[in-house]
């Protein structure tokens, strides 16, 4: 979606918590609906990655990814990991997710895959460490806030050796703040019901 950086476009964010705009790839204009497929996992900056991370970072252009990581201080990817406050980053992800949601007028479905859940994401250029949480299942929803909240709640119910390590990381990095900020923007709710499809 962002093969031509000169064609990036900006989405304004209403009532921002941290960032006032989101920068996305030009080809995003070609779509008025989408399915967001996410592999739930830990993340070294955001605590965890799920639907909201995919909706924010995943849809951002290269400049937009830096913009979110730096909480509106820079569009330069080389500066993207230098000293951003953890609450600023997780708030920026919640802000950015709202811009894409409202651009699509809610025409988005979300799938979170909870298999091979690792504490870390391989987006940092290294292989994720060994999985220490058993496979939980797959969730689908039209609510990005509810699906991420439900995913984390299901991880909390596991008793595997890696569960506490991941949950401590999410807490330390203020990961659930992304869910809170997205809910504040009105793109979903943390209230949910789980229904089996089989």
Predicted regions mapped to residue ranges:
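Extended, low-polarity segments enriched in aliphatic/aromatic residues
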Residues: 1-198
């Amino acid at each position: 979606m962002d093969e031509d950086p000169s064609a990036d476009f900006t989405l304004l964010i209403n009532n921002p918590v941290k960032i006032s705009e989101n920068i996305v790839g030009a080809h995003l204009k070609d779509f008025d609906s989408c399915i967001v497929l996410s592999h739930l996992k830990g993340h070294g900056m955001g605590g965890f990655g799920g639907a909201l991370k995919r909706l924010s970072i995943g849809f951002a252009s290269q400049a937009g990814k830096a913009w979110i990581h730096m909480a509106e201080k820079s569009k330069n990817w080389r500066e993207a990991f230098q000293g951003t406050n953890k609450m600023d980053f997780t708030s920026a992800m919640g802000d950015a997710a709202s811009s894409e949601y409202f651009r699509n007028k809610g025409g988005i479905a979300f799938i979170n895959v909870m298999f091979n859940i690792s504490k870390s994401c391989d987006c940092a250029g290294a292989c994720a460490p060994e999985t220490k949480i058993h496979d939980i299942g797959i969730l689908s929803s039209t609510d990005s806030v509810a699906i991420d909240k439900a995913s984390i709640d299901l991880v909390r119910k596991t008793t595997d050796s890696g569960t506490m390590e991941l949950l401590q990381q999410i807490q330390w990095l203020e990961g659930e703040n992304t869910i809170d900020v997205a809910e504040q923007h009105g793109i979903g709710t943390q209230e949910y019901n789980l229904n089996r499809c089989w």
